């Protein structure tokens, strides 16, 4: 039987995506076995993340500054806005270095099954950014899932009255695929072949 501290750590790790109780227990045992090489650096990294990272009030990205480095970068094309579901999607697209504009993170996607409604996402903030003017194109970069496409259609309907070009990523993306898991070549092709939302 393990100590309460080990059980607490195991339960905390098991809440992370992709880790169940058995994987979490193996991770805890590894950290304890390699205490100086693994546990110390992990603790320092977690502390730094907790102390220094914040959510950008403009786009929802996670960074050390607010506004984030992308929103504050004058080299970014402020006329282009790419809307993504999660921060991981923003990072995946930004790694491709093909999108010259700025981003907007919704914080999820619409889902009747999970009870996620439009007011649960940062859609109103997105509408406000577009209503403020200066944006010529909005790229809807939702995942190719039912919920992702439902979210894209909802946003397209909300943006219908705005004078912006509305495009979405080409569907060379696999149906059911998530942006964070795609290679940069696939993402690059999807960005290049984006098309108007109909």
Swiss-Prot record:
InterPro entries per the UniProt record, alphabetical: DNA_Rcmb_RecR, Rcmb_RecR, Rcmb_RecR_Znf, TOPRIM_dom, TOPRIM_RecR
Pfam family, one: RecR_HhH
Zinc finger intervals, C4-type: 56-71
Keywords associated with the record: DNA damage, DNA recombination, DNA repair, Metal-binding, Zinc, Zinc-finger
SUPFAM superfamilies linked to this entry: Recombination protein RecR (SSF111304)
Domain Toprim stretches: 79-174
GO biological process: DNA recombination; DNA repair
GO molecular function, a single term: zinc ion binding
Stated role: May play a role in DNA repair. It seems to be involved in an RecBC-independent recombinational process of DNA repair. It may act with RecF and RecO.
HAMAP family: RecR
Name used for this protein in its record: Recombination protein RecR
